Design a protein with these regions (language model features):
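Short, surface-exposed binding/anchoring microloops in extracellular/periplasmic proteins
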Residues: 30-71
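Bacterial N-terminal signal peptides
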Residues: 8-16
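Short, low-complexity intrinsically disordered segments
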Residues: 1, 13, 59-62
Length: 139
């Protein structure tokens, strides 16, 4: 009995000094949808925050889980020919897989966000073209 009381007291002492994990960190996983806000199952994701040259619209998600999200969308990509300012946007259907969950800093309420995307585009004459994108916490 004495041993059980000491064990319970020790556990309470340990738990009281442990840092608390925010509730948001334990639950849902978000993605930076437009470089300024988080979303779950967004229909729009901007992959290139600097110039807006690669983004998706009409996103539909077949699955959205803590560690992986899978969906399809229309992807719009600037060919940057002759330059990115004078380039042409091409639209293609494709699939997206979000993965690599990380916690954003305090300013973002410790939210868990997907930081990697694998995008497979259905390109005429070329078949499937795969891109990898790095997503980040909000700017």
């Amino acid at each position: 009995m004495k041993r059980a009381v000491m064990l319970a007291g020790t556990l309470v002492a340990i738990w009281s000094v442990m840092p608390l994990v925010p509730v948001a960190a334990q639950g849902r996983t978000y993605v930076s949808s437009n470089c300024t806000r988080f979303a779950i199952r967004p229909s729009y994701i901007l992959f290139t925050c600097a110039d807006g040259g690669f983004y998706m619209t009409q996103g539909e998600w077949a699955g959205w889980h803590r560690y992986r999200a899978v969906g399809s969308a229309l992807f719009h990509r600037n060919d940057c020919t002759p330059s990115c300012a004078g380039g042409t946007f091409h639209t293609m259907r494709g699939r997206i897989v979000l993965h690599d969950r990380e916690r954003c800093p305090d300013a973002h309420r410790h939210r868990q966000v997907f930081t990697r995307a694998i995008i497979t585009l259905d390109v005429r004459l070329l078949g499937h073209v795969r891109y990898r994108a790095h997503l980040q916490c909000l700017l």
